[in-house]
């Protein structure tokens, strides 16, 4: 049966369809669409008029420390969502991937597939479309089969949580637009000063509130001390798993309150209480590079495992060179 691919560039044109993968949802598309610096596209695959799969990509502006300094990169979380159990997932993915590559390279210097659930999925299709793999690491906490989220924490982490609370810090879920604005401004300052990771416009979090938080597909947690937000975390929920997308705390100014630690602790505890099976930390780095954030989250009892990311550059000579190096 021939597969029909439809590409959507406007959220208003996307029909409502079933699915549980937030990273390939209409709601996340609309958040990207409404956030400055992002251009989303969604590919819908259908057979006999029925949707069978979808793949969401977001093109964003990126500033680099080496030429070209300003680029557009296309990011995809996972390898799509498949809506029927009998679907030939890899074949469908192969067709969506070829179509996405053609579409995205018109406006992007780089395409990146990240946070893959199965590192081997779609291998031959990535290779046939001239992508190259880079080994990566993932860290996630298993939350099922334990009495509480703290069961696998290191003893020092437990002590820090108790000290932070004893020293006046309070942790709760953000519930107002003002709290979300203060949280995002605080975290933007932290990311720009010491974390080499993209941080979106404040509008991203405001629309996360209206599109995802109200439907319990996301939450923002805040750490307060004397009515000031000094830390926080943002989580997205997809299927049976939780994902910690952004987190941080003003640890130098408020060292005795351990705001960064409390922000992660609250996210893990809430995910466990709400029955999620895992909490995955979204960006823990390359396997051969010392990574302070990875070392930090591992002390919450998570397990480290190998995965990969797939990349494709627009410049053919550069892409061919990296294929020779990486494959």
Regions found by a protein language model. Give the residues of each.
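A conserved beta-strand-loop-helix scaffold within acyl/acetyltransferase catalytic domains
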Residues: 2-48, 52-64, 116-138, 144, ...
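Active-site/acyl-donor-binding loops of N-acyltransferases
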Residues: 9, 31, 58-61, 126-148, ...
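Short, high-confidence coil segments that cap the C-terminus of an alpha-helix
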Residues: 38-40, 105-109, 218, 273-276
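Conserved acyl-donor/pantetheine-binding loop and adjacent beta-alpha core of acyl/acetyltransferases
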Residues: 59-78
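Aromatic (often tryptophan-rich) hydrophobic motifs at membrane interfaces
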Residues: 75-83, 94-99, 206-316
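Non-catalytic accessory segments adjacent to catalytic cores
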Residues: 91-135
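Short catalytic-loop micro-motif centered on adjacent basic/acidic residues
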Residues: 110-113, 172, 279-282
């Amino acid at each position: 049966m021939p597969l029909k691919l439809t590409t959507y560039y406007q959220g208003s044109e996307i029909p409502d369809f079933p699915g549980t993968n937030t990273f390939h949802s209409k709601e996340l598309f609309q958040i990207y669409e409404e956030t400055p610096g992002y251009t989303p596209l969604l590919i819908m695959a259908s057979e006999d008029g029925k949707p069978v799969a979808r793949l969401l990509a977001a093109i964003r502006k990126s500033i680099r420390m080496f030429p070209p300094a300003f680029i557009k990169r296309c990011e995809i979380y996972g390898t799509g969502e498949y809506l029927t159990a009998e679907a030939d997932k890899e074949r469908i993915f192969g067709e969506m991937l070829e179509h996405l590559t053609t579409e995205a390279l018109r406006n992007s210097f780089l395409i990146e597939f990240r946070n893959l659930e199965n590192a081997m999925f779609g291998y031959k299709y990535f290779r046939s479309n001239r992508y190259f793999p880079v080994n990566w690491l993932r860290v996630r906490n298993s939350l099922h089969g334990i009495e509480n989220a703290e069961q696998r924490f290191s003893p020092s982490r437990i002590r820090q949580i108790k000290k932070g609370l004893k020293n006046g810090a309070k942790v709760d879920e953000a519930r107002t637009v003002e709290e979300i604005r203060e949280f995002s401004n605080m975290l933007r300052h932290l990311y720009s000063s010491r974390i080499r990771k993209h941080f979106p416009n404040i509008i991203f979090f405001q629309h996360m509130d209206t599109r995802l938080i109200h439907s319990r597909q996301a939450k923002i947690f805040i750490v307060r001390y004397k009515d000031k937000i000094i830390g926080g975390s943002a989580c997205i929920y997809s299927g049976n798993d939780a994902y910690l997308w952004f987190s941080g705390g003003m640890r130098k100014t408020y060292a005795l309150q351990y705001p960064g630690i409390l922000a992660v602790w609250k996210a893990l505890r809430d995910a466990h209480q709400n029955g999620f099976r895992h909490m995955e930390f979204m960006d823990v780095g390359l396997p051969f590079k010392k990574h302070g954030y990875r070392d930090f989250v591992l002390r919450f009892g998570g397990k480290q495992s190998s995965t990969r990311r797939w990349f494709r550059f627009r410049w053919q000579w550069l892409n061919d060179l990296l294929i020779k190096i990486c494959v």
